[in-house]
């Protein structure tokens, strides 16, 4: 149980630290509401895959690449409609 609590605390720390930067990054691709939604989705996937356990430098790269790819996927879907 203690380990799960540490995981949640670490995840919350990562979210607090990176989410604002990632939302600004996503807004270069999509509007604010969609940027926020995309960043939240990326963090949910991060939790599911336990990616937050990566070293900080790798984690930052994974987060930015994941957000970029999610934005591009969203734009492709919107373009197809």
Describe each region flagged by the PLM.
Residues 2-12, 23-41, 51-57:
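Short, charged helix-capping/linker segments at alpha-helix termini
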Residues 4-5, 18-19, 45:
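Short hydrophobic/aromatic segments of transmembrane alpha-helices and their interfaces
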Residues 15-19, 64:
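Amphipathic, non-transmembrane alpha-helical scaffold segments
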Residues 25, 45, 70, 74:
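Short alpha-helical functional segments enriched in proximate histidine and acidic residues
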Residues 37-44, 48, 57-69:
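Structural recognition of an alpha-helix C-terminal capping motif at a helix-to-coil junction
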Residues 65-81:
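Arg/Lys-rich amphipathic alpha helix in sigma70-family domain 2
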């Amino acid at each position: 149980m203690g380990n799960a609590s540490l995981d949640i605390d670490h995840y919350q720390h990562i979210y607090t630290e990176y989410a604002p930067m990632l939302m600004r990054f996503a807004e270069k691709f999509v509007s604010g509401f969609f940027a926020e939604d995309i960043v939240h989705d990326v963090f949910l996937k991060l939790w599911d895959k336990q990616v937050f356990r990566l070293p900080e430098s790798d984690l930052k790269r994974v987060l930015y690449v994941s957000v970029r790819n999610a934005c591009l996927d969203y734009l492709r879907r919107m373009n197809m409609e």
